[in-house]
Amino acid sequence: MIHVTSAPVGYQESLPQRNLALNHPQSAEQQVQAVFSAVLAQFGKQGYVSAQPYAESTPLVEAVATSWEQWFNEFSSTRYSFVADSGSPSVRANKTRDDLRVDYQQILTNAYQRGGYADPSSYVKTLSKEELAAIQQVHHLADPISTDSLSSEAALNLLLPPDAQVDENRDGLTAAGAAYSFRFPDSNTPANVRLAWEATTKDLPEEERLTRVMQIGLQIIIANMHFDSNGQYVRSSQPGDADWVNPQATTGFSFRGMASDWLDYLDGFASQIPPDQLQRDRAFWSSFQANLGLFGE
């Protein structure tokens, strides 16, 4: 199953302030992305391309622990349940919120100090059953983690906080354990596109933000659908298949072009769309297209 997630709004600047964006204080989300992008860079891997460079005086090993703690303190009350049998199969019996914070913090610190990010597929096989259970809870994985056949990306993301996970193979999805998610912005979204997105969505209700994320993800789903000569649906390529494609990774793709395509679609099907929905959709895609231009995409 592919889950859809929307990154929390980080930058809150108005458009006239767009050139000052990198001078703004970092949110917990931005900080964890900056820290773990620096960690991955030490091991020859790409983190968030939109992350600000890590330039703090705090040693990175300490920043690994503190950035996770800050992120957890901000998001744990809304993202995690700590009641066994509450409907979440990943909840650990007799474990508290503080247990999860401390346990995963130690897992992250150990992974950094022991070089686990160099070969995550091998490293996760050294983790104990208890450590894997903590990771399962952090990442909301439905089933216990099997380390035998994980891809490099799926293993790596077990060792990264949720908002620092990366789409390593650029297939448009983020794999963690056996789970896939589509998120936008993701680790490969350029900084100017992320700024345009956040300027466009900062005042939207979360439900509408998720709707817009799903509309962007729909492009990948459609690109992987196959039809016969009569236009009948035959099958869909699955993540990992040789014929799986990510349109956003193709030469010539632009988000402004995608926004233009959505506006063309709305014009073509205007008579079939409820007027209030049509107005909202046109307003969103026109705003996103304009902001992309303002931020230089």
Region locations from a protein language model:
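Type III/flagellar secretion export determinants
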Residues: 1-297
